[in-house]
Amino acid sequence: MLRPYQQNAVDAAKAFLSKCYDSCIIDAATGAGKSHIIAELAQWIHETSNKRVLCLAPSKELVEQNHGKYIAAGGMASLYSASTGQKSLEHYVVFGTPGTVKNSLERFKNFAAVIVDEAHGITPTIKFIIDDLRAKNPQLRVLGLSATPYRLGSGYIYQLDENDRAISEHETTDPYFKKLVFKIGAKELIDQGYLTPPTTEHHDGYDTTGLELNSMGKFDARQVEKAFEGEGRKTAAIIAEVVELSAGRKGVMIFSATVPHAKEVMQSLPRGNSALVTGETPKAEREQILKAFKARKIKYLVNVSVLTTGFDAS
């Protein structure tokens, strides 16, 4: 059963998609359960159109997560992603990664809709897929979901907000989606008891005064290295405090600045109860580590720019 706000999001999307062919987007904060919203809408679109539905996500983990929620809700769906080892179109609802789908578009026919998870990261590949499927079906519906429907440098990714206010040229450049149909933020979810209020701790260990954002809105890699790497004693003191403060917690995720910094962090964590995932971690090992963390077989999971988007640790 959907939570009330999830049902409201579904209803808003249904109302919009039922009356026009324009694209729309749902803005739901991290932790809102977008996978459940996707599952409900994919099932509804298939049942009302008797056609296929394609659900895209940027990573293997997200594709499997969304697929799993759909199956758990009682539906039947296929996986189409090389990284999962499956390229199936057996069922009407298909969960896939953009790269794998693009390479096999001749197989993708009779689709009623494309649902894009993490839609703020919409790429030329995703647009190419949508254009191809729309050429095959001019009535194709397109729906996006994101916790941050905004791109640095180009602004909001929709033309109209939930109140039909046109987003000005100062706030957006060439937005892909026509309308924001539903929005719920983290504060609302906390106030309603669906998210745990965040608590913060401050440690004076690292000197980050030299860190500055570049033109892409990111920190310079060399400045990050200078601030965080080679500070073994400071790192050890910070991690000791993390271990102490998390004594009653079942799982702890730690986000490190660089791979050398992550290795310093690992040196201060309990051996046998912690693991590290980076972009270089082999797929099989990475999958094994994530399964162990979700199963509470390890408590501390350190990562470097890997588990930053849509990861569900439950």
Provide a role label for each language-model segment.
Residues 64, 79-89, 253, 262-265, ...:
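Conserved helicase ATPase core of P-loop NTP-dependent helicases/translocases
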Residues 36-37, 46-72, 257-260:
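Conserved Walker A/P-loop ATP-binding site and its immediately adjacent core
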Residues 175-253:
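Conserved interdomain linker/interface between the two RecA-like ATPase lobes of SF2 helicase motors
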Residues 70-106:
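Inter-Walker segment of RecA-like/P-loop motor cores
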Residues 19-42, 255, 302:
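Walker A/P-loop
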Residues 93-132, 303-305:
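Conserved RecA-like ASCE ATPase "motif II neighborhood" in helicase/translocase motors
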Residues 121-198:
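Post-DEXD/H (motif II) to motif III coupling segment of the RecA-like Helicase ATP-binding lobe
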Residues 1-27:
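Conserved pre-motif I regulatory segment
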